[in-house]
């Protein structure tokens, strides 16, 4: 196996891991919105986007940019954190 194919395989593994984590975050945000009985319209208005776009985010048709994802979290009063595997940062 060449170095280029090792990098390609590694890159695919990273992308799959990130997609899984991303899906997990979106799923939790949707669950929180529903548990709190908040409408998509309310969340979209707070973020400053169209309701249709929030629906696309929730169905994972379109991925929100990091800024919008953070605004979504802020609206639900939850926060994303950054950490390392060893717990140090």
What do these predicted regions represent?
Residues 48-64:
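Recognition helix of helix-turn-helix/homeodomain-like DNA-binding domains
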Residues 27-46, 71:
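Short basic helix-loop element that most often maps to the first helix and adjoining turn
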Residues 29, 43-44, 54-57, 83:
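Conserved hydrophobic/aromatic packing and binding residues within compact polymer-binding modules
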Residues 83-89:
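Short amphipathic recognition helices of helix-turn-helix/homeodomain-type DNA-binding modules
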Residues 2-35:
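A short, Lys/Arg-rich alpha-helix, primarily the initiator
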Residues 65-82:
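DNA major-groove recognition helix of helix-turn-helix/homeodomain DNA-binding modules
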């Amino acid at each position: 196996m060449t170095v280029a194919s090792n990098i390609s395989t590694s890159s695919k593994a990273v992308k799959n891991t990130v997609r899984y984590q991303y899906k997990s975050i979106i799923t939790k945000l949707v669950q929180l919105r529903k548990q709190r009985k908040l409408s998509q319209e309310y969340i979209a208005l707070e973020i400053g986007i169209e309701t249709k776009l929030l629906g696309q985010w929730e169905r994972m048709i379109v991925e929100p940019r990091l800024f919008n994802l953070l605004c979504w979290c802020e609206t639900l009063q939850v926060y994303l954190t950054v950490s390392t595997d060893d717990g140090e940062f």
